[in-house]
Amino acid sequence: MIARTLRTVGRQGRNLLLPRITACRPLHAIPANFSKAYDHDGKTKVTIFNTETDLGLMVTGYSQYGFRLNNDMVLIGPISVFPRSVLSWNVNSFEDINEDSLSLFPTLEPKIDVLIIGIGDQAPPPALSKRIIEFMKKYKINVEILRTEQACATFNFLNAENRMVACALIPPLHLSYNENDILQAKLRKKELYETE
């Protein structure tokens, strides 16, 4: 009896609300590659991108000395990261970025859609941005010039979407720490010096 009353009230409530929803944005269909996220026995699976090596290389960490990738490889110095490979990049700072240091990217096959350049911890100078964009425009390659932290995140996102992307990264000179970083360091130190 109570269940029947609740169903009736629920139907009437929905009917009252439906006419009011007039301008609704359509939802996009779920891509085919997410069809594995729901198992038919009611279980939902979660995939953390930067631990999945099937999605290609991703930058999971950086320091003043270099970068850590999702396959646990640690690289020292500036690097060029591609979806399936990584190379050392022969620049010391953003002042060294010129047509010669970028000459690798237009010659790649298959052609990349986007080149992301992480220039350390400083904001990109307008003169550098203009020079790089004009050079890459000749080869019809889009360029994003960002701080290294933002460049790593952008590369990981585009790589997870299976875009043809490359990333050139210079390690930052200064790192910014947040409360979580300090807490993690304290916990690691406690585990290291903990004796039984």
Curated annotation (Swiss-Prot):
Phenotype of null mutants: RNAi-mediated knockdown in thoracic muscles is lethal.
Protein's cellular compartments: Mitochondrion
Keywords: Mitochondrion, Transit peptide
Cellular component terms per the entry's GO annotation: mitochondrial inner membrane; mitochondrion
Listed GO biological process terms: mitochondrial respiratory chain complex I assembly
A Pfam family recorded for this sequence: DUF498
UniProt keyword Signal present: no
Transit peptide region: 1-93
Broad class of the protein's primary localization: mitochondrion
Domain of life: Eukaryota
Keyword set includes Transferase: no
PANTHER family from the UniProt entry: NADH DEHYDROGENASE [UBIQUINONE] 1 ALPHA SUBCOMPLEX ASSEMBLY FACTOR 3, NUCLEAR PROTEIN E3-3
Family according to the record: Belongs to the NDUFAF3 family.
Physiological role: Involved in the assembly of mitochondrial NADH:ubiquinone oxidoreductase complex (complex I). Together with NdufAF4, involved in biogenesis of complex 1 modules N, Q and P-peripheral, but not the P-distal module. Required for recruitment of the complex I assembly factor Timmdc1 to complex 1 assembly intermediates.
Subunit-level organization: Together with NdufAF4 associates with mitochondrial complex I assembly intermediates during its biogenesis.
Name recorded for this polypeptide: NADH dehydrogenase [ubiquinone] 1 alpha subcomplex assembly factor 3
The organism of origin for this protein: Drosophila melanogaster (Fruit fly)
Gene name for this UniProt entry: NdufAF3
